[in-house]
Amino acid sequence: MSKVKNIAVVAHDNCKKELLDFVDCNHNILSRHNLVATGTTGGLVEKMIMERVEQKADEGYEFKPVNRMKSGPLGGDQQLGAMISEGKIDVLIFFWDPMQPQPHDVDVKALLRLAVLYNIPTASNRSTAEFLISSPFFEGEFQRKETDFSSYTQRKL
């Protein structure tokens, strides 16, 4: 995993405010990485980072647009899952709402399953996200252990 990470950020509606506060508090770090997000969350995160980068333009901050997928219920979670399986996501920050059933719960479960399957560092709440972003691995090199799936892919049916 290179120093510049591809970070997926997702938040259910009741968690968007908390995610935006996290982004605001950590925009100086996050602006150095490539962000990918589901639709609505991506728009809000992009706006937040753009405002902060504009405020600090004289300090050499550069704005990188957020790569926005579809909204979660419209397939965005599955798009992120596909990116994880293709090796295109390094970190997943997903503030999900444990108190609110979602119409796309199966998609959420699939996304989280793929993050575990491919050993992607994942934060599902603010505390874990703060631990992740403060790790020396977040901005440094990190060799993620990859699982060998050959016994599964080469099994005889």
Curated annotation (Swiss-Prot):
Annotated NCBIfam families: MGSA, PRK05234.1
Tagged with keyword DNA damage: no
Gene3D superfamilies named in the record: Methylglyoxal synthase-like domain
Function: Catalyzes the formation of methylglyoxal from dihydroxyacetone phosphate.
Keyword set, alphabetical order: Lyase
Entry EC number(s): 4.2.3.3
Binding site for substrate: H12, K16, T38, G39, T40, T41, S71, G72, H104
Name of this protein: Methylglyoxal synthase
InterPro entries associated with the record: Methylgl_synth, Methylglyoxal_synth_AS, MGS-like_dom, MGS-like_dom_sf
